[in-house]
Amino acid sequence: MNFKGTLPTLILEALVREPSHGYLIAQRIKQRSQGVLDFKEGTLYPALHKLENDGLVESYEGMEKGRPRRYYRITESGRGTLTKDRAEWRKLSQAVTIILGEA
């Protein structure tokens, strides 16, 4: 299955509690999906940059273990988008569950 279209929503969800750097965002998604969703850097960072260009996340420089890192945090606009995306995903998920249950 291709979950690429859901990546922006998953990134926003990963950032809703606290800012994070890209690697940690990917790890959160992987852990919460029990390893099903494992996004690589080549997929994750373009999505983060698009979210930043769209004003849904913002980034800043920080340090972790003496190394510079770029951290991302969700904006108020991003929170609004996430709320809308959650509702749309629940509706879609329910419809698919109904259809698959008929098989």
Pin down the residues of each PLM region.
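Generic recognition of well-ordered alpha-helical segments
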Residues: 27, 31, 76, 91-94
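N-terminal helix-turn-helix DNA-binding core of bacterial DNA-binding proteins
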Residues: 2-43
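Amphipathic alpha-helical dimerization/coiled-coil segments
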Residues: 82-103
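Absolute protein N-terminus
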Residues: 1-2, 103
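Basic amphipathic alpha-helical segments that dock to polyanions
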Residues: 44-51
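Basic, amphipathic "hinge/linker" alpha-helix immediately C-terminal to the N-terminal HTH DNA-binding motif
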Residues: 67-86
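Beta-hairpin "wing" of winged helix-turn-helix
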Residues: 52-68, 73
